[in-house]
Amino acid sequence: NNCPHDWLPMNGLCYKIFDELKAWEDAERFCRKYKPGCHLASFHTYGESLEIAEYISDYHKGQAEVWIGLWDKKKDFSWEWTDRSCTDYLTWDKNQPDVYQNKEFCVELVSLTGYRLWNDQVCESKNAFLCQCKF
């Protein structure tokens, strides 16, 4: 694996939690600037989401929720990944997504679920975030 030592290697990609609190779009911009081809993280299997949850539980300092790369760009309940990968796996927390007050269009990992389940959230909320890169 070619991942730097504090990144999680998985399926040919590398993942890292950043504890700095940012709004969703700023977090995506940060990941993209980190290295070409980087994005907020995407997930495609239950196994991946468990491994990520374990990694975040081990390395995340603080209690903040964690942004991932899923968003409802068109605001029409069509969730998509910023890396344009296939939206083939969704693991929402119960009663989510609810697009509460028609304002929640970005997706976070919920700390109370051990970072295993997802919630839609107001994109301007400040969260920690998970970048995914190829090195």
UniProtKB/Swiss-Prot annotation:
GO terms for cellular component: extracellular region. Residues 10-132 form the C-type lectin domain. The keyword Repeat does not apply. It is found in: Secreted. Expressed by the venom gland. Ca(2+) binds at residues 96, 98, 104, 119-120. Its main location: secreted. Disulfide bonds join 3-14, 31-131, 38-133, 106-123. GO terms for molecular function: carbohydrate binding; metal ion binding. Keywords: Calcium, Disulfide bond, Hemagglutinin, Lectin, Metal-binding, Secreted. SMART domains: CLECT (SM00034). PROSITE patterns: C_TYPE_LECTIN_1 (PS00615), C_TYPE_LECTIN_2 (PS50041). A motif (Galactose-binding) lies at residues 96-98. InterPro entries: C-type_lectin-like, C-type_lectin-like/link_sf, C-type_lectin/snaclec_domain, C-type_lectin_CS, CTDL_fold. SUPFAM superfamilies: C-type lectin-like. Homodimer; disulfide-linked. PANTHER family: MANNOSE, PHOSPHOLIPASE, LECTIN RECEPTOR RELATED. Beta-galactoside lectin that agglutinates rabbit and human erythrocytes in a calcium-dependent fashion (MHC is 0.21 ug/ml on rabbit erythrocytes). Galactose (15 mM), lactose (20 mM), rhamnose (20 mM) and EGTA strongly inhibit this activity. Belongs to the true venom lectin family. This is C-type lectin APL. It comes from Agkistrodon piscivorus piscivorus (Eastern cottonmouth).
